[in-house]
Design a protein with these regions (language model features):
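Glycine-rich beta-strand-centered segment in the early N-terminal region that forms part
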Residues: 25-43, 54-95
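N-terminal Rossmann-like NAD(P) cofactor-binding module of classical short-chain dehydrogenase/reductase
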Residues: 90, 220-221
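NAD(P)H dinucleotide-binding glycine-rich loop of Rossmann-like/cofactor-binding domains
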Residues: 82, 92-155
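Short amphipathic alpha-helix with an adjacent loop that forms part of the alpha/beta core around
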Residues: 203-214
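Glycine-rich phosphate-binding loop and adjacent beta-alpha segment
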Residues: 227-300, 334-335
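Mid-domain Rossmann-like dinucleotide-binding core that forms the NAD(H)/NADP(H) cofactor-binding site
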Residues: 126-201
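C-terminal hydrophobic helical "lid"/dimerization subdomain
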Residues: 2-3, 281-335
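Short glycine-centered segments of the SAM/dcSAM-binding site in methyltransferase folds
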Residues: 88, 150, 174, 240-241, ...
Length: 335
């Protein structure tokens, strides 16, 4: 029986060089746990935050990053009744007592944590399902039950943004996106965007109004903050909402409340969003993921193109994450 496994560990947070490939004892199932053998491991933004030690939900050091793993059930602990050896599953750290843990060849988790995967979803595609879950939640929370005809998705070729584009198109919405390169523009259009415009915040509202007969969009999804959040607000239709789901560029220099007041006749709103809203609502959180699995299995949404790297190249993968230039999903192969 194998006694050791490979994993990626962070002892001293920092840049990509902080990621160390180590050998650790093979995890042993406790009662009520299953051991999952990894086939594909997703690499994304939360992993970078664990690596550099700034994640709000930081696991204790030494920490194993990784928030999504797809693989097969390899062993059962005493008392397990709901899963079987050989079943294909997705492990999301949103379902675990602490975040991280997926940059490893094996992981032991409570039997009620994994999601069973249909054969129609490849392992390397399954690690993008968390972005479908998040995008669904944002669309549902978006406009307070008001009808949504159109949305604005800056950076429409990004991981979460690609899923927003597809879900909105699936529901018959007009999707205006922005993209910074011809390749990203083609990617967004291929995944359901109705139109792609220049993303420069200075002229973004005018470009949106030109495509919507002067009306604007019902929802605008901002992942940057700074001047882009202001541009999203200014691009809204009456009763529209700008949703801030990240703040990579820092807060805007302008007073957001005064910006809303200056557009008072349109009755606009700004909503922040985090998937951690559902940390205490297991039933809804899991329902969103089960819905995401169904949508991908049915072909209503597609996983983005994947780039697969051996676990030995994890530092290079994180350099690519830091640069933000990669198109599609970065995936680690444990073997």
């Amino acid at each position: 029986m194998q006694s050791l496994m490979r994993a990626v560990q962070v002892n001293n947070p920092g840049g990509p060089e902080a990621l160390e490939l180590v050998e650790l004892p093979m995890p042993v199932c406790k009662p009520g746990e299953v051991r999952v053998r990894a086939e594909a491991i997703g690499a994304g933004g939360p992993d970078v935050l664990i690596r550099n030690g700034t994640y709000k939900w930081m696991p204790p050091l030494p920490a194993i990053p990784g928030n999504e793993m797809a693989g097969t059930v390899e062993a059962l602990g005493p008392g397990v009744t709901t899963l079987q050896v050989g079943q294909r599953v997705l492990v999301s750290s949103r379902e675990l007592p602490q975040r991280g843990g997926c940059y490893a060849e094996f992981i032991c988790v409570p039997e009620d944590a994994p999601f069973v995967l249909p054969d129609s979803i490849a392992f390397q595609d399954a690690v993008s399902l968390g972005n479908v879950q998040l995008a669904q939640a944002m669309l549902l929370a978006g406009n307070g039950g008001l009808p949504v005809r159109s949305i604005l998705v800056p950076g429409a070729a990004g991981g979460v943004a690609t899923m927003l584009v597809q879900l909105a198109a699936h529901h018959g919405m007009t999707v205006i996106g922005t993209a910074s390169t011809p390749e990203k523009k083609a990617h967004a259009l291929a995944h359901g965007a109705s139109a792609i415009v220049d993303g420069d915040p200075a002229g973004l509202p005018d470009r949106v109004f030109a495509l919507t007969e002067g009306r604007g969009v019902d929802l605008a999804f901002d992942h940057i903050g700074a001047e882009l959040l202001i541009a999203c607000i200014r691009s809204l239709a009456p009763l529209g909402t700008a949703i801030s789901y990240n703040i990579a560029g820092g807060p805007p220099a302008r007073d957001v409340f005064m910006e809303l007041r200056s557009l008072l006749s349109k009755s606009l709103a700004v909503r922040t969003f985090s998937i951690h809203t559902f940390d205490a609502d297991r039933q809804q959180r899991r329902a969103l993921m089960e819905k995401a699995i169904g949508l991908m299995s049915q072909g209503a949404v597609r996983a983005p193109p994947t780039r697969v790297f051996p676990m030995t190249e994890v530092q290079e993968v994180h350099r690519m994450l830091d640069a933000g230039a990669s198109l599609g999903k970065l995936v680690l192969a444990p073997r």
